[in-house]
């Protein structure tokens, strides 16, 4: 029996009820999770897979809340995240040492992001690697430079974001206009009686929050490991320029690096872009080799 064919609860019957129901599924200890994963891997035991899926439905819902600002029904976003969770359970290898939550976060986010991109493609939202990065990182980049105003960004803000994300100014302007709709409020009622709000459900999820924090710490460690391995593949100059431009809290300017290396500002920018593309390619290949993403 395939994991994808498992009967998993859906928020289609009412989001408030769904969120209440999934809280009834117990979390798994590390030993329980390992045992269930082995049962699925060795015997294709559907009950083992089902327990792994249901014990992580709250994790999916919590991750999905982070994508509520893209104008799509949150129930549909959760459903797509559940698809990613089932894929993670199918491919999970417990002997590699990390928990299912850590591994599943990659799949849940990828599934949700692909769904959002498919939905936004109806208005011809681009799907190049750079546009995907811009689509999912623009809000964070705006907050980092305190660009909280409504409407168009100031030219200096556009330039800062474009440099940080490695895209064109025009792409930042276009994407900002497409994503300028208001976010769903955390104070929006979950039920018709108005007694339960999004923030109530999120704040009460102490156990899943702890698991999420552990998973995020493990995921960060995995990403750092991939980054360190990929950096070795760069030349000394590429590594230095990329570090100075993209990995420091206070990036060195193109002009400063150009003076340091005795080349033009444009040449430094080209080296930075080339190094970043090489780094991304190497990290993705490593992630595929570790079975973290699809080829």
From Swiss-Prot:
Residue interval(s) of motif Interaction with polymerase core subunit RpoC: 76-79
Region described as Sigma-70 factor domain-2: spans on this chain: 52-121
SUPFAM superfamilies for this protein: Sigma2 domain of RNA polymerase sigma factors (SSF88946), Sigma3 and sigma4 domains of RNA polymerase sigma factors (SSF88659)
Family annotation (CDD domains): Sigma70_r4 (cd06171)
InterPro entries: RNA_pol_sigma-70_dom (IPR014284), RNA_pol_sigma70 (IPR000943), RNA_pol_sigma70_r1_2 (IPR009042), RNA_pol_sigma70_r2 (IPR007627), RNA_pol_sigma70_r4 (IPR007630), RNA_pol_sigma_r2 (IPR013325), RNA_pol_sigma_r3/r4-like (IPR013324), RNA_pol_sigma_RpoH_proteobac (IPR012759)
DNA-binding residue intervals: 254-273
Region (Sigma-70 factor domain-4): 230-281
GO terms for MF: DNA binding; sigma factor activity
Subunit structure: Interacts with the RNA polymerase core enzyme.
Name recorded for this polypeptide: RNA polymerase sigma factor RpoH
Species this chain originates from: Caulobacter vibrioides (strain ATCC 19089 / CIP 103742 / CB 15) (Caulobacter crescentus)
């Amino acid at each position: 029996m395939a994991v994808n064919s498992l009967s998993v609860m859906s928020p289609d019957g009412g989001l408030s009820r769904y969120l209440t129901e999934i809280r009834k599924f117990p979390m798994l200890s590390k030993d329980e999770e390992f045992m269930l994963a082995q049962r699925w891997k060795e015997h294709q035991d559907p009950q083992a897979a089902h327990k792994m899926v249901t014990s992580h439905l709250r994790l999916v819902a919590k991750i999905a809340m982070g994508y509520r600002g893209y104008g799509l029904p949150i129930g549909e976003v959760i459903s797509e995240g559940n698809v990613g969770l089932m894929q993670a359970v199918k491919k999970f290898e417990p002997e590699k040492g990390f928990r299912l939550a850590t591994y599943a976060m990659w799949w849940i986010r990828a599934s949700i992001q692909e769904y959002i991109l498919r939905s936004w493609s109806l208005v011809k939202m681009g799907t190049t690697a750079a546009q995907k990065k811009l689509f999912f990182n623009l809000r964070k980049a705006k907050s980092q430079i305190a660009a909280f105003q409504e409407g168009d960004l100031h030219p200096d803000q556009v330039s800062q974001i474009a440099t940080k994300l490695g895209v064109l100014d025009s792409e930042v302007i276009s994407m900002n206009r497409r994503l300028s709709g208001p976010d769903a409020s955390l104070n929006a009622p979950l039920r018709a009686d108005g007694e339960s709000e999004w923030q109530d459900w999120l704040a009460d999820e102490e156990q899943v929050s702890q698991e999420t924090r552990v998973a995020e710490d493990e995921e960060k460690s995995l990403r750092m490991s991939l980054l360190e391995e990929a950096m070795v593949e760069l030349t000394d100059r590429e590594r230095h320029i990329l570090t100075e431009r993209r990995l420091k809290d206070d990036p060195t300017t193109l002009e400063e690096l150009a003076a340091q290396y005795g080349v033009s500002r444009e040449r430094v920018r080209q080296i930075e872009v080339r190094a970043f593309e090489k780094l991304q390619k190497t990290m993705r290949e490593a992630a595929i080799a570790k079975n973290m993403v699809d080829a």
